[in-house]
């Protein structure tokens, strides 16, 4: 999602390595037991890759964090070639653009002050009051009083749209069910022969891209509470419901979110909002409704930051926001669900 030198730390996101070490296969359409809080090694492999100091940059990594214009603005980042992403690569002429959005500088509750303010003394790499400033990827370096993005250069300094200096923690609930026919039978893909998994997707209002419903962890809030709250707000429009409706939604969500689940990913995210000094980290968790009965009793309704919400078939054709497609692929692999019509691609992983 302080001061020790990090290497290139390009977010190469070596999920193929993670998948090779943790993916559990089962026969097609057979329910896969989901032990609570599994998949820790997935986060380990990616975290180790980011923090390793490797000098090699892959063209398909750390891309969204270098895109221009910066979201919600006309600001163009300084261009960062693949071979110069990593901090270990010397680049004396590196001249990133400085940008922090007006909405952040206005000083809302969710945002830090400017580093230059005399009364602001953040405790980086540790819990700072109610604000979690520790990274899920390990220690990050501080340079000239500012945290340095562990994944490398982005062409932009400041915070952009992000409120916190350093890691900005989010939570992404991935709610899944099996696609079924009118008789209630699971539907298999005609090519792969595997059952088709569906997940709840929202269309973001800010950029129009489809995404996993999720959001920022409030100060002092537990991840489990964030996961449930964000799903209720964005996929069920709970903020606009009456007290009685909210209680009913809460009861049904409790049944779903208190069951066995899979922690799919924890750590840095290649996100278009990232800067050299502020970046997104997330914990993506899969809650699976095996029978479909729980979600059948909940009506999807877009709310808060979501413009639309719907069930989406999972496949490699999905085009999703930030790193969400990678998270969804991990879920498909773990559930032994359909992902690709290319059997070779299925066996290779990402």
From Swiss-Prot:
Cofactor field: Mg(2+); Mn(2+)
EC category: hydrolase
Residue span of region Disordered: 53-78, 117-153
Entry-linked InterPro entries: NUDIX_hydrolase-like_dom_sf, NUDIX_hydrolase_dom, NUDT9
GO molecular function list: ADP-ribose diphosphatase activity
Classification via PANTHER family: ADP-RIBOSE PYROPHOSPHATASE, MITOCHONDRIAL, NUDIX HYDROLASE
GO biological process: one example: ADP catabolic process
Pfam families: NUDIX
Keyword Cell membrane attached: no
Composition bias type Basic and acidic residues, residue spans: 124-135
Oligomeric form and interacting partners: Monomer. Interacts with GLOD4.
Modified residues (Phosphoserine): 121
The protein's Enzyme Commission number: 3.6.1.13
Transit peptide, residues from-to: 1-46
PROSITE patterns membership: NUDIX
Catalytic activity: ADP-D-ribose + H2O = D-ribose 5-phosphate + AMP + 2 H(+)
GO cellular component: cell junction; cytosol; mitochondrion; nuclear body; nuclear membrane
Primary role: Hydrolyzes ADP-ribose (ADPR) to AMP and ribose 5'-phosphate.
Motif Nudix box, residue numbers: 215-237
Family the UniProt entry places it in: Belongs to the Nudix hydrolase family. NudF subfamily.
Positions of the Nudix hydrolase domain: 178-334
Protein name: ADP-ribose pyrophosphatase, mitochondrial
Subcellular location: Mitochondrion
């Amino acid at each position: 999602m302080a001061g020790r030198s990090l290497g290139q730390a390009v977010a190469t996101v070596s999920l193929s390595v993670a998948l090779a070490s943790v993916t559990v296969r089962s026969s097609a359409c057979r329910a896969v037991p989901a032990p609570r809080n599994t998949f820790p090694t997935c986060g380990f492999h990616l975290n180790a890759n980011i923090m390793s100091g490797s000098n090699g940059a892959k063209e398909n990594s750390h891309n969204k964090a270098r895109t221009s214009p910066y979201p919600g603005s006309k600001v163009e980042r300084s261009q960062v070639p693949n071979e110069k992403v990593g901090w270990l690569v010397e680049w004396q002429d590196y001249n990133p653009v400085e940008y922090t959005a007006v909405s952040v500088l206005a000083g809302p509750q969710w945002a830090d002050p400017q580093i230059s303010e005399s009364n602001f003394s953040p405790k980086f790499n540790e819990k700072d009051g109610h604000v979690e400033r520790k990274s899920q990827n390990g220690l990050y370096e501080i340079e000239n009083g500012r945290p340095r993005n562990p994944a490398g250069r982005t062409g932009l300094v400041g915070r952009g749209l992000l409120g916190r200096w350093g890691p900005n923690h989010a939570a992404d609930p991935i709610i899944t069910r099996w696609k079924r026919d009118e008789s209630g039978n699971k539907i298999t893909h005609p090519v792969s022969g595997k059952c088709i998994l569906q997940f709840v997707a929202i269309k973001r209002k800010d950029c129009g891209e489809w995404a996993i419903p999720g959001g920022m962890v409030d100060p002092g809030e537990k991840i489990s509470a964030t996961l449930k709250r964000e799903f209720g707000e964005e996929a069920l429009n709970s903020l606009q419901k009456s007290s009685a409706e909210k209680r009913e939604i809460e009861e049904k969500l409790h049944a779903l979110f208190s069951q066995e689940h899979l922690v799919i990913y924890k750590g840095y995210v290649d996100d278009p909002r990232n800067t050299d000094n502020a970046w997104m980290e997330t914990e993506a968790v899969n809650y699976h409704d095996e029978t479909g009965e729980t979600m059948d009793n909940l009506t999807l309704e877009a709310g808060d930051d979501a413009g639309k919400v719907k069930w989406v078939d999972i496949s490699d054709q999905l085009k999703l926001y930030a790193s969400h497609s990678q998270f969804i692929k991990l879920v498909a692999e773990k559930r032994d669900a359909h992902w690709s019509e290319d059997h070779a691609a299925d066996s290779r992983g990402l």
